[in-house]
Structure formats: C-alpha cells, structure tokens
C-alpha cells in the first residue's frame, strides 16, 4: 500500500482543522505546523481509535504507552527550534509519530525504544512514509546512544525525576533538550539549554507523561 492509498481527503481536512486548533493553543512555528499538516497521524494510532486520530488528545497504543496529544508534540518540537541541519536523539519512539515530525524538520533522527514491538511497528510506519533519515534502536533510553553522540537536540517523551546523566553528557554544548521532569503523576516540561557545561532550564508548563524507565530512570 502506498501513502496515497491511505491518506484520504477526509484525513487531510482533519489535519487542517487540527492545525487551526494548535494555532489557537499558541503554537507559532509555521515549520512545525506544516509538519503536523503533512504527517498522517491516523496511521500511528490503533484502528479502534482511528476516529480520534485528529482530536487534540493522547491515545493508548498498547504496552501501557500512549501517543502524545498533538499540542504536546507541537510544543516540544517548537521548543527544539530545529533549523534543518541538526542531529536529534529521541528517547521513547512509541508509535513513531513524534519521530516522523522530527524527520520532517531535522537532518538525522536517532530514536530509542525499550519495547521491541513498538519499535518494530514504528519502523514500518516510518519506512512506509519514505523517511530515510531515521535510525532505530531497542534499548534503555536513559543511557542515550553514545555511538553517535554528541547531539544538537535531545527530546525525551517519557517523564523522569531528573535529567539522566548520560543524556547530559551526550548533548552538544550549545544544544537543547526538551524533557518532562517531576513525579509519576505530574511533571513540568522543561527546555534545557547547555552552555559551557552548565544547564539552564525554562519551564514550559505542566504535563503528564508515562514514566521513563531504565538505569537512570524509574525502576518499575
């Protein structure tokens, strides 16, 4: 099946409506809005939630994981301030939707998922959409992906009680990380900028993410 076969006009219309909602919610980056308009979110959600694919809400994708609310995807991507030549590390591939948005806007995307089944499904979707700048790994995201570090940008799509040390080390000086930090039930989304080895935080507001599990994350 090709992209044209499943991206029916009704879905394109729904994406346009979603973009208008995101504008009203305060998303300003036209590049981010264009990526949201282009990437078919409906292929990243389970079939039973197809009718909700373009609602501004998070949806279950199995394995106690979710596909993030489109507003949060847009907010996190906007905070990364991508120019098009960056190497990005994504922690938590999930459905692959955020990965596809990043692939639209960055030079290279390295994405890690601890649940093999999710990673394999995401890889199929990314291939179907024709992206050739995404590299997948199954493993502990809190350890990062040292082989290809340092990264210009790091995005973490699960909640941590603090910034995992390996991610601090793998972020290029002058780089930006977007990560939810807090407890299990509520967090704040932070834009972290690394300058001369120091880390500066900007609070982007309250959020709720699934926990980041791993050696430098939650243990259970």
Curated annotation (Swiss-Prot):
Gene Ontology terms: cellular component: cytoplasm
EC annotation from Swiss-Prot or TrEMBL: 2.1.1.77
GO biological process: methylation; protein modification process; protein repair
Chief localisation class: cytoplasm
Catalytic reaction annotation: [protein]-L-isoaspartate + S-adenosyl-L-methionine = [protein]-L-isoaspartate alpha-methyl ester + S-adenosyl-L-homocysteine
PROSITE patterns given in the database record: PCMT (PS01279)
Localization annotation: Cytoplasm
Keywords attached to this entry: Cytoplasm, Methyltransferase, S-adenosyl-L-methionine, Transferase
Origin: domain of life: Bacteria
Residues annotated as catalytic: 68
Enzyme class, spelled out: transferase
Pfam family, one: PCMT
Keyword Iron-sulfur: no
Family assignment from sequence similarity: Belongs to the methyltransferase superfamily. L-isoaspartyl/D-aspartyl protein methyltransferase family.
Protein task: Catalyzes the methyl esterification of L-isoaspartyl residues in peptides and proteins that result from spontaneous decomposition of normal L-aspartyl and L-asparaginyl residues. It plays a role in the repair and/or degradation of damaged proteins.
Name of this chain's protein: Protein-L-isoaspartate O-methyltransferase
Lineage, broadest ranks: Bacteria, Pseudomonadati, Dictyoglomota, Dictyoglomia, Dictyoglomales
Gene transcribed to yield this protein: pcm
